[in-house]
Curated annotation (Swiss-Prot):
Function: Acts as a chaperone.
Segments of skewed composition (Acidic residues): 628-642
Protein family according to the UniProt entry: Belongs to the heat shock protein 70 family.
Modified residues (Phosphothreonine): T201
InterPro entries to which the protein is assigned, alphabetical: ATPase_NBD, Chaperone_DnaK, Heat_shock_70_CS, HSP70_C_sf, HSP70_peptide-bd_sf, Hsp_70_fam
Induction record: By stress conditions e.g. heat shock.
UniProt-recorded Gene Ontology molecular function terms: ATP binding; ATP-dependent protein folding chaperone; unfolded protein binding
Alphabetized Gene3D superfamilies for the sequence: 1.20.1270.10, 3.30.420.40, Actin, Chain A, domain 4, Substrate Binding Domain Of DNAk, Chain A, domain 1
SUPFAM superfamilies tied to this protein: Actin-like ATPase domain, Heat shock protein 70kD (HSP70), C-terminal subdomain, Heat shock protein 70kD (HSP70), peptide-binding domain
Species for this entry: Francisella tularensis subsp. holarctica (strain LVS)
Keyword Phosphoprotein recorded: yes
Region (Disordered): 609-642
Keywords annotated in UniProt: ATP-binding, Chaperone, Nucleotide-binding, Phosphoprotein, Stress response
Taxonomic classification: Bacteria, Pseudomonadati, Pseudomonadota, Gammaproteobacteria, Thiotrichales
Record's protein name: Chaperone protein DnaK
Amino acid sequence: MGKIIGIDLGTTNSCLAIMDGKTAKVIENAEGHRTTPSVVAYTDSGEILVGQAAKRQAVTNPDNTFFAIKRLIGRKYDDKAVQEDIKKKVPYAVIKADNGDAWVATKEGKKMAPPQVSAEVLRKMKKTAEDYLGEPVTEAVITVPAYFNDSQRQATKDAGKIAGLEVKRIINEPTAAALAYGVDSKKGEQTVAVYDLGGGTFDISIIEIADVDGDNQIEVLSTNGDTFLGGEDFDLALMNYLIDEFKKEQGIDLHNDKLALQRVREAAEKAKVELSSAQQTDVNLPYITADATGPKHLNIKVTRAKFESLVSDLVMRSLEPCKKALEDAGLSKSDITEVLLVGGQTRMPLVQEKVKEFFGKEPRKDVNPDEAVAVGAAIQGGVLAGDVKDVLLLDVTPLSLGIETMGGVMTKLIERNTTIPTKKSQVFSTAEDNQPAVTIHVLQGEREMASANKSLGRFDLADIPPAPRGMPQIEVTFDIDANGILNVSAKDKATGKEQNIVIKSSSGLSEEDIEKMVQDAEANAEADKKFHDLVTARNTADNLIHSSRKAIQELGDKVTAAEKEKIEEACKELEAATKGDDKQAIEAKTKALEEAFAPIAQKAYAEQAQAAGAQGGAKAEEPKKEEDVVDADFEDVEDDKK
């Protein structure tokens, strides 16, 4: 059985970890970084770029560079939060799919579901793991925000499937961070608050870590959050400030200039990071735009105090879910023994200060906010594989689940913060005499009014025998698995007739859709390999042309005019071939140039060897005394000392 890898699929960055023996290890990507930007770009040449390569070209390709896709995954286009995101943040097209989901589209009109785009990031993670382990990887534990609903969880599983991964478990991000902390911690019983402010989402979980019969038991007592609050919003606040200041100075609004907007977005993110350690920073963007009077430059000084004033309401927004989580756990602030900060945005001093004020204690600084979640996912993978034996994880469902009953009311069967897996049944009846069927409308949320909650799906239980209203007994059962994914069944107790629904297509993707996307992904992988091979052939050809011409120049009179002409002709033919897309033609012309140059190279080498031999014979004198040799100590310099 292969390794089950742990992936933190983040809004801004993603991270990969695996179990190495008894410890979890974060794996560096091909570029040597421990985190990978969750950015996917589609280039004009048809290449798909993922991570740093995609992020680097975002300024010149804003329409086809997709970031923060996690904020759209498993969501409907008409969601208020999605509409706000479209208005404020993204330069790419967000469209309404046939099923009402929020999808994205390239400027060429190619439509893609968010799980399809996220799958590209997961595929890069999968390849990184395979390169490191030297074996195929097919199974993963993927993390999601604790406050993700059923649709978003299922859409994340779909993304894994499209990427060629069997998702063995979906685990909540704060729970994963607590798992990473709890496995290393040997302090006995603790009640930990995990404050997780990432790139696009915020979660707070109250978690109890206890030693039960020698096992580390990690039990989630409550969870709360906001799936539209994160570092991207902090970037946006600063970006809008910079644009407004520029408009005051120059009278030009950059909001409608996609290229300028992307440059300001990147500068805002960079300035935000700098202001975590510096009191002020300069945002300097030359040639940001131009008008009739000439080019315009953006140069604005931003102080930490100014930035904090711009985002203070965002930080305060995160404290309300903290209060609710404590209430749901039945605890007070004084009951919390440790506060863990997770997510890159928690590096901001104002966030740390407000969290300290709220809980009345200093948050721990020994947990890496970028890596803890992936480490926890890898540990959970180790538990599932049987490699980690002394850990028991008890997670919860973040939102209440129920059905719509008479009068448009939501009747809850499973309350929020119930430990999962769990199963709950309740008996309902008909609302009218001789009612032949009932519709089971499955809902998720906390509102009393059914229409105000998230609809997960509906199904009918038909062929109910005629009876007065209130007489038939319809038993509805909700069954949630360890991934937080729901199975609902309804049974007529009189006839034994049963109907059920697995809420698995709530992401809007059917099995056929997913299978098609898997095939597309495999086809893309083949196309990517062909493109890579073509580029390699071109690079080899370019190097050979350069080295051949340089050698002819250096050899001068030692090469005849006929030989020079033959080499130049072969170089020109190879240059012409590299302008096309025929890899075999490039390789054939490369071979032709190599064969044309080989006799010249051999002749030059023979002459060089002969000259060197003659020179060596003339200088065969007594060796020089080693009086100038100095003894020295050498020290291996580690990478971080270089």
